[in-house]
Every structure is written in structure tokens, then in C-alpha cells.
Amino acid sequence: MKRIRQTMRAVVHGSGLRRLTPPQRVTSGTVVLGARHLSKSYGARTVLDDVSLDVRTGEVLALVGPNGAGKSTLLSILTGDTPPDRGEVTVLDRPLAAWSPAELALRRAVLPQSFTVSFPFDVVDVVHMGRAPWAAVDVDVDDDRVVADAMAATEVTALAARKFPSLSGGEKARVMLARVLAQQTQIMLWDEPTAALDIRHQESVLRIARQRAAQGDAIVVVLHDLALAAAYADQVAILSQGQIAAYGPPAEVFTAKLLSDVYSYEVEIVSHPRTGVPLVLPVR
């Protein structure tokens, strides 16, 4: 672990790269990520059509909608991995393109839907990769402690010495989430983080999102499970045919008519008897 950290810092020092100033955290409720009039097409197929939204610190924003609605494309544009045909993404009121990759890596972390690690690294070394952006910053931080905390939060401490390729799909997903947490950014974008997980670990991942939001972070998460979105998200953006059909708190936008129309399948909404959270049930 220390070898990786020392190597990263040696590369920065030896290359003459500019040292970076650590980012200042912003207060809860601040818009840190914005999308304005985003559109994207692939050939004749329009994937996103004039989509705008704001992401605020202290909130979990869930992107939901049926397959092909544009959720992952929207997230990919927000991360900068995919350029929009029209529109603009801003990070902290600056155009996304105005940030260098190194500056951006100190401010936002991305958990992709799929991931590969080409070499048989130990799990702990994979998580340590999340600390790489901080090698260019003069801060007194115990990287080993940050990594240990991230691994404990995602319950992968016992996997530390395992080779990453040997893990199950769910184990890999939790390790990659630990890597994102170890990056310690105030903005996080997660693409279907619960897809490969059992119910206990699905709940655990979304509890982490809520905890990080309570600490002032901004989390954007793509979810298929409407129950998870209703239980853990502060705001939801319901995508349908490349547009935002509704945006707001789950209790306000999860209506039977809207969801039935969006998913082309009749559903009903009932309130959880204990929490009052809306439950979306298919009509059978």
C-alpha cells in the first residue's frame, strides 16, 4: 500500500507536474453540478432531448426510468466521458471542459456500470488507486486510514489480500465503490451501483449514499429499483424517451399515472405502513 502511494508521489515530483491546491468544500445545498439543455443522438436515434437539472450538495439525486430512457447516457455526459451534441455541463459554475482531468479528479468521482482491472492487483491496491489524484496535492492525510475506512464501509476488508479478478461480480462492485469513497470527492456519480448486489448490500450501498449526503456530499445515482429510489433519494429525475418526465422528491413525483405511462405497465402506489415512503407495486 505504501509502495503504491510512494510511487504515485514520486511520479508527480519527478515529472515537474504542477502541484495542485486542495479543493475547498462548499456548503450543503450548493449547486455543484449543472446540466443545461443536453441533447445526444446516435444516428437517427435521439437518446437525450433538452435535459436540464441541478445537483446539490447534501442530496442524493436518483436517475430512474425504463431501459433505454437515457439514464446512463446522461450520467456519462455529466462525468465528461461522453460529449453532448448540444448543451453544457458545469462543475462548480465552471464549464466541465475548463477543468483539467487532475483538478476534476479532486472534485468528483465516478463509479461506472462496468469495470475492468487489467492486472491481478490485490483488492487493497485497487482501493488505493482512489488516492491517486491526491498525490499531486500537499496535504497531510493518512492514505492507509482513508482506504481502510472505505473498505470497512463497503464490507470488503476481509478481501484485502484477494486478487481482484478472482472476486464475484458483487464483490467487485463493492471494491470499486470503496475505491470511489477513498477518492474523497464532494461530488460522486454512481451508475447502477446495486445491480450485482444482494438485498443486504443494496441497502448498505444506499445507506452509504445517505450518510455521505448528510456529510455534505452530492451523489447522483442511476437506479432501476424504484423502492430504493423512494427510500433513499432526496430528489428523483424520471427519464422517459430521452426527456425528464418529472423531477422532485419521490413522494411528490411517484404517482401511479405517471409511472404507469413511463414504464408502459400499470402500477399502483401505496405508502409504507411504518415509514410512509411510497411503494411502487405492479398491478397483477
From Swiss-Prot:
SMART domains: AAA. Keywords: ATP-binding, Cell membrane, Membrane, Nucleotide-binding, Translocase, Transport. It is found in: Cell membrane. Its EC number is 7.6.2.-. GO terms for molecular function: ATP binding; ATP hydrolysis activity. Its main location: membrane. Pfam families: ABC_tran (PF00005). It is a peripheral membrane protein. It comes from the Bacteria. Residues 33-266 form the ABC transporter domain. InterPro entries: AAA+_ATPase, ABC_transporter-like_ATP-bd, ABC_transporter-like_CS, P-loop_NTPase. It is an enzyme of class 7 (translocase). ATP binds at residues 65-72. GO terms for cellular component: plasma membrane. The complex is composed of two ATP-binding proteins (HmuV), two transmembrane proteins (HmuU) and a solute-binding protein (HmuT). Part of the ABC transporter complex HmuTUV involved in hemin import. Responsible for energy coupling to the transport system. Belongs to the ABC transporter superfamily. Heme (hemin) importer (TC 3.A.1.14.5) family. This is Hemin import ATP-binding protein HmuV. It comes from Thermobifida fusca (strain YX).
